[in-house]
Amino acid sequence: MPAERPVLLAFASTWEDRAAAFLDRLQTVLPGADIILVAEFPPPREFAGVRWIPWFPRRTLRQNIARIRDELRGCRLAWAALVLDRLLPYWPMRAAALWISRGRLLLFNEQMNHFALRPGDAPQALRFLRWRLRDWIHRQTHPGGWLYTQLWRVRHPRAYLRPLFASIALAAGFHARFWKSLRRAPPLRLPDGGLPDGVSIVIPSRDGRPLLEKLLPALERELGQIPGEILVVDNGSADGTARWLAQEHPAVIAEISSEPLSFSAAVNRGIARARFRHVLLLNNDMEPEPGFLAPLRAAFEEVPELFCATAQIFFPPGRRREETGKAVWRRKRARPDFFVHCIEPVEGENLSPVLYGSGGCSLFDTARLRALGGLDEELRPAYVEDLDLGFRSWRMGWPTVFVSASRVVHHHRATTSRFFKPEELQTWVEINFLRFLLRGAGDAGLFGELWRTAVDRLNWHAAQEPKRPWAMFALRAACRAYRYLRPLPPARMDERLILAAGSGAIAVFPGRRRDPSKPLVFVLSAYTPWPLSHGGAVRMYNLMRRAAEDFDQVLIAFCAGHAAPAREILDICTEVILVEREGSHLRPMTDRPEVVEEHDEPAFHAALQLALRRHQPDLVQMEFTQMGLYADDCRGVPTVLVEHDITLDLYRQLLAERNGWETRQQWQRWERFERQLWRKVDCVVAMSQRDAAMMEGARRVEVIANGVDLERFSPSAEAPEPRRLLFIGSFAHLPNLLGLEAFLRRAWPRLREAGSVLHIISGANPEHFLDLYKDRVQLSLREPQIEWEAYVSDVRPAYRRAEIVIAPLLASAGTNIKILEAMAMGKAIVGTPAAVNGLEIEPGADALIVPSVEAMADAVLGLFENREARTALERSARRKAEACYGWDAIARRQAALYCSLINRPPRAAAS
């Protein structure tokens, strides 16, 4: 931006929807001045000419100011402006505006009236302060204001009870946290001696004879093929259940209590009498489908040290499905929400971890259940016992999984609703959840966080109208926290990882059958390799497909949302584990690169650790640099890091283009992280000899180049469309956007005048990435001679139609698979040196490589006119692809690497 042009620096310290009015108003303040917006989010689309500087709320004030000042280099700041929005004060942003403006600051109110910080605008400033004071007094003296609330409480002294109870509850939690940091029970040990194989079915029942009449015949049929027993705990029934059982079902064992017991006490009586290896806890209002036991039992053969396998729950037709069996810790919780909930299973998933198994339809390991002491009888009369039991088992490293093929129908609260009111049930849930925190959570720091959040939630509910008595009852109970504390044995699993494992972020999908004769390879990836929407996916899928002949594979990958994996992936993997990742700009700047921080997810750590225990792989391969952060979880297993790009090299190139503060910060962090990572893993895979030469200090480096499917991508006999250009590059990759922007600005005007048509394929979610990188790239793709598509499942027709493929990259790391595809299709390629980094390409023979983006216009126009030169490039490109870049040969090099790392000769791996 020319230094002589003035700029208005707008700090959007207001709501996103008010930013448009703010920018509208600024355009009238200094006509002709460029506006630069400092905001969390990009400017609205109608303000395409407004430059954006992102504001990062979790970064320090100093870091944000440094970023803004760097972006203002070469600009003359005429004025800074900010909005004094009462409801969204943004104090750090206000401080930055004051610091950067050096007094040249315009202050706007919510009505977009403004004044400057100068003596001449004192009257306007005083009017604003007077208006704001009147507004403050009005709010304070009306319902919702602090002063109004205090005066109202003086007139209604009982209203002080709620904040008083909340304060006492917080103090009780502080005491409990201190107590937990000091007290520990001895380590837990499993009892000696095995139990016979079979299932003991424990059914608590109170006046449930009509339900048992339907349930017991189905259970007796279920136990016809396996050893087992049915124990009915007759819990204070007055309907003659015990006498009826003796007459109609003499094989059923009846444990009789003359008085009603709590749910935990009743179930524990049944557990104490169980004779078999597994205990099925089943409510009498459950209706199991035939064959529901077999999948539950099979889970214990699949998952080592499994504590519980829980069934999928359905509700009768016409009723809302309140439970699914997939009970998880709520990841995104609004203030009123409870902490756990049930989520819908994903089609095809099985053995996904859940926080706990429903106490009404779950199969347990009897020895482990008894070692934990059964259900906690302090959680009375009912509810939250299963959550407490599941969490305590996870602490011991004993997981709970969801078994989708085991199905039951729940006639919800068919017993409790006959004896208790909904208000009573809600009260028990709330009080027992507090007791669970006190008795089940051992990590003092985590307990403190959860306790504060739980008390805050109850305090909020207790303040609502109409009154919610259950919230006040629970707050009062929280004040007596000391009564329920108990020491816990040392945990074998981090409690924060337990909540992550049981958050619903992990979904497990079985693939093809495991072949024990084949080595097992874990593939950790930032993305799933299908669909083939970017070069990394193309490489992963082609090598995994070929590796599947000699190796079994488990894919653990991030995803934006759970969906059944494509059949193409399930056919080459024994299991696919998908972990949801929710990207966010609300992260502090640490000593690691931003992308690494974004991929450091507790749920992925939990998924990986559980999978390592279950499958015990021979090798772990981490695809993409950021996934190397999980190397520490894989100690004891050979590790391979696949460097699709050397990211520190990419940022070094970006710095050479523009020495910006943000780029410099990220480059410094990549330098530290990437070089440390090379020394940590057993082998680093580079895409080219050029990349391998940079990996100083690595234990071992192997070059396994990118490739192309030579059969799928082959020359076409049909003639291309004259003067048609093709650019393929995912907008998720910033260098693609930077290169395309440079091409459109520096070369495209001449080509457009010559009648060219540019076809752009940008990959999935291009609008998202255009917004994400709006501070770096401004693209205008809406013009007649530009055809723009997002994700295209089959790009071959696009290659066939194109006369020339362009690759105008300014910076690049790794090697470009799209170049290889174009070569295999026999297309003439015009690109910059960065576009062919690391490829064995002879410039002028295999592709036309020009020194700059500007020079691409002449090169393209020349090839349009010179068909012979274009044909020579096309033939040479295809020959080079055939000679050097077929996937089959590349896959053999990868297989040899695997075998060398796991000390198994290739022939043995293939047998």
Tell me what each language-model feature is:
Residues 218, 234-243, 766:
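A conserved acidic beta->alpha catalytic loop
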Residues 18-30, 539-540, 703-796, 800-801:
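Conserved catalytic-core segment of nucleotide-activated headgroup transferases in glycan assembly
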Residues 395-486:
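Active-site-adjacent helix/loop segment of glycosyltransferases
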Residues 180-182, 198, 266, 272, ...:
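Acidic/His-rich active-site region of diverse nucleotide-sugar glycosyltransferases
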Residues 161-221, 509-517:
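N-proximal low-complexity "stem/linker" segments adjacent to membrane-targeting elements
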Residues 279:
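Short aromatic/hydrophobic "clamp" motif used to bind/position activated sugar donors
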Residues 257-274, 284:
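Glycine-rich, basic loop-to-helix element that forms the pyrophosphate-binding segment
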